[in-house]
C-alpha cells in the first residue's frame, strides 16, 4: 500500500544487493533510512488520525491529518511523490539531499515534533479518548510474542522492542 510503499523497494533492493554482493555507499544507506523514517512518521500519523475518527473525535482526526499533511508535503518536496516514494533502486537511491533541502526537512520536523507531543498528550489524558479506548484491543504479551508482532503493537503489548534497533536493516 502507499503507506508502506518505500519499505517494499527498500527491502527488495537490499535482498538483490545481498544476493549480488553489492555494497552501497554509506550516503545511500543514510538516505534510505531517512526516506523510511519520513514515511514511518507519516504512516503512524495516518493511523493515529484513523483511530481518532473511529472513536468519534473528529476535531482530533482533522488535527492529526493536518500534521500528517506536513509530512506528505515533505515527501513530495524531497521525493517528488506523496505516496509511492520511488526513492530506492538497486545499488543506492534515486535522489539526493542538498543543504537547502536538508534545512527544509529540519524546519518541517521542528514544526511536526511539538504537534506530535500535543497529540500524544491528548491521547494520554483526554477523558473521552480514555473512556473510548481503555481496555480495548488488548493483545497479551505472550500472544504478541507468539504472533511475532512488531512496532507499536509490540510495544503496546509490553514488548520493549524496535526492529530498527533489534535487527538493524541499514
Stretches with model-predicted labels:
Residues 1-170:
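Active-site bordering "gate/hinge" segments
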Amino acid at each position: 500500500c502507499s503507506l508502506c510503499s518505500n519499505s517494499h523497494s527498500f527491502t527488495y533492493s537490499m535482498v538483490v544487493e545481498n544476493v549480488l554482493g553489492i555494497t552501497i555507499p554509506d550516503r545511500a544507506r543514510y538516505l534510505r533510512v531517512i526516506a523510511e523514517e519520513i514515511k514511518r512518521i507519516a504512516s503512524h500519523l495516518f493511523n493515529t488520525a484513523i483511530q481518532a475518527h473511529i472513536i468519534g473525535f473528529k476535531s482530533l482526526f482533522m488535527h492529526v491529518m493536518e500534521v500528517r499533511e506536513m509530512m506528505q508535503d515533505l515527501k513530495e518536496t524531497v521525493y517528488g511523490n506523496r505516496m509511492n516514494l520511488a526513492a530506492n533502486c538497486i545499488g543506492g537511491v534515486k535522489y539526493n539531499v542538498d543543504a537547502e533541502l536538508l534545512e527544509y526537512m529540519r524546519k518541517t520536523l521542528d514544526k511536526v515534533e511539538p504537534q506530535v507531543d500535543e497529540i500524544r498528550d491528548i491521547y494520554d489524558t483526554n477523558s473521552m479518548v480514555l473512556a473510548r479506548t481503555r481496555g480495548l484491543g488488548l493483545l497479551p504479551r505472550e500472544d504478541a510474542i507468539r504472533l511475532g508482532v512488531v512496532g507499536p503493537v509490540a510495544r503496546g503489548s509490553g514488548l520493549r522492542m524496535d526492529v530498527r534497533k533489534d535487527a538493524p536493516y541499514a
